[in-house]
Amino acid sequence: MKHVICPVCGNICIKYGKNKSVSQRWLCKKCKSINTPKIDNLTKQLNIFLKWLFSKDIQKDMPGGGRTFRRKTSKFWDIWTLPPVVEEKHSVVFVDGIYLCRNACVLICCDRNHVLGWYLCRYEHANAWISLMSRITEPALVVSDGGKGFNKALRKVWPHAKHQRCLFHVFSQVRRYTTTRPKTLAGAELYALAKRLLHLETRSEADKWVDEFLDWMRKHNKFLSQRSLDENGNWRATHESLLKAQRSLSRLVKEGTLFTYLDEDLIAEIGKVPSTNNQIEGGINARLRALLRNHRGLSVERRIKAVFWWCYVHSPRPLSVSELLKVMPTDKSIAAIYQKISELDKRTLYIPTWGDAVVWGELHKSSEFQNYWD
């Protein structure tokens, strides 16, 4: 049985009759204070809401045919669950973005156990990554799929963190350019090299792979330099897709982000280093897509909030329901802030200040002759 704790001294209370509204009173045996604790239904309602959100249940099967459920849980759709500031240093973090529609992307950062941060943007760019990463302490290693603007943000926010590009994304990018059945010798050899990239386990194997890639570039340099006329009469590279694959691999080899997971000093510091982004792709993004698929038909705003709720529940130390309702912003509070800013802009726009008012002499001319019709 759950005990009632005294709010004054923290000791266990005993039953002490009932008040006029027939609510149970409780007496503390130590400090003799009497209190009537209120039943907190918000926690129960939030648990019901989250249980529905994270399951395959539909609202029609909820009590009251869904109407009672929607009425009791509508308040939770108004909340924007924002990420906390992470001051604890982590050895490895994973970052990625998930697109919810054409102009809505949620950037997510996690470690092996929890979601550390999330940020809503229209598309992946440097400022969005900076906003996400600036709330998290710099880790020893970050694994990413090479999203747009991430390298710039990494240099600015986490300048000392080492970067490992997800090898599976690198392989997938090459496969997209060469296809799984290349029709040229150069394409077949490059595709075979890309497949081997996923199975390198030592530094010597990685160095050998780089040498073979450089040999491939020298061997097919003349073939890749071929140019031809397109339908508009312009000269273009004949094997443009192969050139894109070659340039992407060359850039990664030059940056030194392909084989960070084989760095012996880093392994000695943090242990085994991951080479792929599977932790966030399979552990978080896949579950978020399943959530949105189970509740398909949600508006874009509710899709975003559903992702925010999932990330918040899986964050390291989520707040209690009472604290969450007090701290987290809502649609109403955000609208009030924008309205206040809008009213301030209107006030400064329409109230004349020094140098803004109309000067009478600029619109009227004075002379020695009398002018009675002005």
Roles of regions detected by a PLM:
Residues 1-5:
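A broadly conserved sequence feature marking short terminus-proximal activation segments
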Residues 7-8, 30:
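Short, cysteine/histidine-rich loop/knuckle motifs that typically chelate Zn2+
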Residues 13-14, 36:
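Short functional micro-motifs and their immediate structural scaffolds
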Residues 15-25:
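Short linker/helix segments within small regulatory modules
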Residues 23, 27, 33-34, 64-160:
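RNase H-like nuclease fold core
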Residues 25, 30-32, 36-48, 141-147, ...:
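Acidic/histidine-rich catalytic cores and adjacent linkers
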Residues 52-63:
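Short, charged amphipathic recognition helices of the HTH superfamily
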Residues 145-148, 152-194:
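Conserved beta-strand -> loop -> alpha-helix junction used to position metal-binding or nucleic-acid-contacting
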